[in-house]
């Protein structure tokens, strides 16, 4: 977990008079810490030789940004908002791997953002009774097939809010990704649902307090919805809509995209039907279709393994490196390969081979999104 100084400095970097996220991310990923960037602000080109003049100048002249960062952190502490910088273990690892991931997120909730299985459900703000019934049946059936899934959406009208409410009703944790700061809620009609989500999931944003819900922010938040997830599910959409933007971003991140077909000629089925016809999404008609396509029948596999008494003491003989991986997974539950590499200090190429061997021995299981699970 990042300390307060690192959090403050990361917020500061987001407030600089500098508009290229790519340039800042390149520097941040190379250094690994906002604090180290600021400590080396007078010799940045020793670290990143091709850093632009504007980037260097913005970092060297950061006093105004520091004041705003201090105000933000004070507010966050007072109102129970958790700032999560990119170098914090709590940061969504799937999102971290994306080229345009935000440097910091702000969170209110209790759900683990790095769960084994994460999906997003998106679509039109004008959800029809057909769409509402699809969401209800899909989530209800999914709960029986795969009970531990984190469901993400945008807390907007229509498909978003129906998905959140059905997730809550079925005992799923659900995250709402917002297009503004956590000092407000848009739309306000969803306050009651949002309050329940904080107790059974959470609210997440990249935006500081006092940030309005401007139109461009909704497009920006869609990349977080897409980046955090293993799969994107489009329920209903007109020929053009925000849900289709999330589908496009999901494809660019290499995520699986699914869509429910609708009746020909229905306005809010046109986007889904077009996406399926153009091979932009896999057609599904049920939760069972989805689980099979994602190869998520592994809940039954894990249950059988436990019933057969596959305990760690009965594992095949392990090498010292294999045992180190097992020890890390036993303490931290599910992890992606990058985090396992960090915690074991084993380079990725070697680690990949070791993980494959452990899976062949029946010691671990791999899931969508590159998550590794220790079979206990």
Task: Mark where each language-model region is.
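Short, positively charged patches
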Residues: 1-147
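Glycine-biased, small-residue-rich flexible motifs in mid-sequence functional cores and linkers
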Residues: 2-4, 85-376
């Amino acid at each position: 977990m990042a300390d307060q100084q690192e959090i403050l400095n990361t917020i500061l970097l987001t407030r600089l008079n500098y508009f290229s996220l790519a340039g800042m991310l390149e520097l941040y990923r190379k250094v690994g810490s906002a604090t180290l960037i600021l400590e080396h602000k007078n010799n940045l080109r020793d670290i990143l030789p091709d850093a632009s003049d504007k980037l260097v100048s913005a970092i060297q002249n950061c006093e105004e940004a520091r004041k705003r960062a201090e105000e933000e952190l004070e507010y966050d502490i007072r109102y129970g908002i958790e700032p999560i910088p990119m170098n914090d273990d709590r940061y969504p690892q799937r999102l971290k791997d994306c080229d345009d991931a935000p440097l910091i997120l702000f969170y209110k909730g209790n759900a683990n953002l790095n769960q084994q299985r994460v999906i997003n459900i998106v679509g039109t703000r004008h959800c029809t009774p057909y769409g509402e019934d699809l969401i209800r049946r899909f989530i209800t059936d999914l709960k029986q097939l795969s009970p531990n899934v984190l469901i993400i959406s945008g807390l907007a009208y229509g498909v978003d809010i129906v998905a959140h409410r059905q997730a809550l009703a079925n005992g799923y944790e659900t995250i709402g990704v917002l297009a503004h700061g956590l000092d407000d809620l848009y739309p306000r009609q969803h306050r009651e649902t949002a309050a329940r989500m904080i107790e059974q999931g959470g609210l997440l944003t990249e935006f500081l307090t006092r940030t309005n819900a401007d139109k461009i922010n909704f497009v920006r938040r869609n990349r977080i919805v897409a980046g955090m997830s293993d799969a994107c599910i489009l329920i209903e959409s007109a020929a053009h809509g925000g849900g289709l933007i999330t589908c496009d971003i999901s494809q660019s991140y290499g995520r699986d995209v699914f869509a429910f077909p609708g009746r020909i000629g229905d306005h809010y089925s046109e986007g889904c039907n077009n996406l399926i016809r153009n091979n932009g999404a896999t057609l599904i008609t049920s939760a069972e279709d989805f689980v099979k396509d994602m190869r998520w029948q592994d809940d039954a596999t894990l249950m059988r393994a436990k019933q057969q008494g596959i305990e760690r003491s009965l594992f095949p003989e392990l090498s010292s490196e294999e045992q180190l991986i097992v020890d890390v997974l036993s303490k931290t539950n599910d992890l992606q390969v990058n985090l396992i590499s960090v915690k074991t200090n084993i380079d990725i190429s070697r680690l990949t081979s070791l993980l494959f061997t452990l899976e062949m021995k029946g010691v671990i299981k791999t899931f969508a999104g590159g998550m590794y699970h220790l079979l206990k």
